[in-house]
Amino acid sequence: MDSTSETRSGSWLSVIALALAAFIFNTTEFVPVGLLSDIGHSFEMPTSQVGLMLTIYAWVVSLASLPMMLLTRNIERRKLLVGVFLLFIASHVLSGLAWSFQVLMLSRIGIAFAHAVFWAITASLAVRVAPPGQQAKALGLLATGTTLAMVLGIPLGRVVGEALGWRTTFMAIAGLSVLTLLYLARSLPLLPSQNSGSLRSLPMLFRRPALVCLYVLTVVVISAQFTAYSYIEPFAKQVARMSGEATTLLLLLFGGAGIFGSILFSRYSEAFPRGFLLAAILALGSSLALLLPLSAQPTWLMALSLLWGMSIMCFGLAQQSRVLRLASDATDVAMALFSGLYNVGIGAGALLGSVVSERMGLASIGNVGAALALAGLLLALFAALRYAEALKSTSL
């Protein structure tokens, strides 16, 4: 093998390692969804209160994403990535050892700070270390790692938690992170900071009403999603009366459907720009509205999870693509804002789901989420009509 081939092979291995890191980071954000009941049992707390872990985590990420990106913009990227992983690993060890819910929350805040920095720099790192002309494939691999977190990471985390205890799940994530860190530290070249953006980009972005509308739409629809999804594990067990194994399968089907959602996006989003996004929101709202009616039939509920998983993946990819194109001159800052606002939606949805669970009962989480999705659909229709020219100019 000549030196060029060796370099290219090494570059791809670095990209794959970054994709594995993406898998790990996305798994840990949502793995509590499959462990709420077990964590609540350990600390003698109701799942509605344990679910606030998701809210606090998401809001820390949302508040930290842009400031952390700006604070670290001059740090060499390999060194920064090592620091992020060390914080991530230490926080997971603390999660595994947590002797109180307060300590567990403190550890999750540490993980959230690491998450905020990781996603501010990883896409650009994957592009920079990819072989020449293979940047799009590198981003595709990164997206695959993210998708697999929903397909495999969360169900596997639940399986480990069910068999060995939820603390073991967090310790296993720490162990896998150590191995990933060792490889990345050895394989990545020195990567000086480039094109990291600045605060000067913010006023320019907020003077683009179509972009602002997309940001608001993201918060509304993601809030709808996580009003129900945050509590799907206790819903499946307490309302649908599903076994632990069936609940794990439900999560697996939901995550696996995301793969088909990404295929639908790649095939149809450009051909049907307006209709694709509207259809995704409509399918999401319908899935949430049918959650309670179909809960009496576990087979139908599992079938519904496929539509649900595809629709939220289609929505997320469509929104990300639109933001990138509407802010092609300030992508780092625009995507940091998108990531932050996406997490605002996660936190708001998890908080609303907690309130609904306590005051109206777990059975109502789907209906409340569906009402929010309807508001999102109306907003998307407004954007499609009001900002038709701006969206058309982005080929979306």
UniProtKB/Swiss-Prot annotation:
Annotated transmembrane regions: 15-35, 50-70, 81-101, 103-123, 136-156, 170-190, 209-229, 246-266, 276-296, 298-318, 333-353, 365-385
Family matches, as CDD domains: MFS_NepI_like
GO molecular function, one term: carbohydrate transmembrane transporter activity
Pfam families assigned: MFS_1 (PF07690)
Tagged with keyword Disulfide bond: no
GO CC annotation, single: plasma membrane
Keyword Transmembrane (UniProt): yes
Matches recorded under SUPFAM superfamilies: MFS general substrate transporter
Membrane topology: Multi-pass membrane protein
Gene3D superfamilies: MFS general substrate transporter like domains (1.20.1250.20)
Intracellular or extracellular location(s): Cell inner membrane
Recorded superkingdom: Bacteria
Matches recorded under HAMAP family: MFS_SotB (MF_00517)
Purpose: Involved in the efflux of sugars. The physiological role may be the reduction of the intracellular concentration of toxic sugars or sugar metabolites.
Family: Belongs to the major facilitator superfamily. SotB (TC 2.A.1.2) family.
PANTHER family: PURINE EFFLUX PUMP PBUE, SUGAR EFFLUX TRANSPORTER
Name of protein: Probable sugar efflux transporter
